[in-house]
Amino acid sequence: MHTVAIIGSGFGGLSAAAYLAQAGYKVTVYEKNKQLGGRASLLEDSGFRWDMGPSWYLMPDVFAQFFADFGKDIHEYITLTKLDPSYRIYFKDTPDLPTGRDHMLVDVSSDLERNSSVFEALESGAMATLERYLARSQYQYEVAMRDFVPKNYDSVFDFFTWKMMTEGVKLNVFSNMDSYVRRYFSSPEMQKIMQYHVVFLGTAPKDTPALYNIMSHIDFGM
């Protein structure tokens, strides 16, 4: 039996360990902390508990598939409660603010209908535009999850296949989020709302491949 050592007990390390053990390997996971590490970490002090991991539960289909791969139903282990609104965006020095106001707050819901009046106030026709934007986002998400995300990239040449080149154009991997969003929305506020997800990547919209617009489908469509 082959043995494998995994450094770090975050979700990546734990999932890798589970798949390797299922495949017949003897697996040992090493973690420097007293509790699970990375995004799976938990801080407990004075009777309080803080999740040290992700603030969003993204790509629920991936989590469900992981449990299914081991013959388990994810809903037997966790119960999810959807937040509404999902998040609040703070706009500073926005034009056309009421007298005496120096900022604007926008609550964003995963329920598109609840966003309608707010988005339309920010940009006329925003909801119709958003429907087109999300339809494209859903298509790109489905293509990415079917053809690219599950693939192993063992060599740099794996990135230069004919399929990668042709589908890459459709997935907008050669443009950035800033220019992509501007094609659809004209108001700075709507542009920032659609680019909000980029903060989780720790980079600027101009430096982020437009492929990441798939996060809008995850946000509003899942």
Pin down the residues of each PLM region.
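Rossmann-like flavin
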Residues: 93-209
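Active-site-adjacent bridging/hinge elements
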Residues: 32-33, 209-215
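Helical element adjacent to the flavin cofactor pocket in flavoenzyme catalytic cores
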Residues: 214-222
